[in-house]
């Protein structure tokens, strides 16, 4: 549809990269951007990333131009014409933060050593195990609904629970043993991480949710 109507398609992949497998080239996406602090584990304030389709890697495109987007081979020649890198680097404007890049590189090396297929496969198995465990709790739907799609191809690792009552109390209790995220007014977000969470930890989490629900009976 975008191609037929001469529309440039850009995607915000904020919490997708490192969490969901995607092939931007096969979908002919024009450009995309994402953060790295969460599912790529580079930490708060971590650098972002960009993707630019190779069909846009050309010299005559109108864009913001900066020192670090110029080819390194001619950067210090002080040419009057912008000599862009023929990659996404041609869109870089200024000096990236070196320390943050170092932290990001260390994280990416962990992903590479683990193998991306292994990471995504374990993530799917972990989140499926979590989903099945939560939905098997007796009378869970009296307290919360699972608002994340059940089909693993329609989601990443995060499972969101929409609480019908006592959401802050639930969050307070579960946070004594597990790291989860609370979003007002009544959503608790849970995301088992394949690089360091185990199936046993997911089992313990589901058991704790079950215990808390039973304590309200």
Where are each of the predicted segments found?
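Pyridoxal 5′-phosphate
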Residues: 1-217
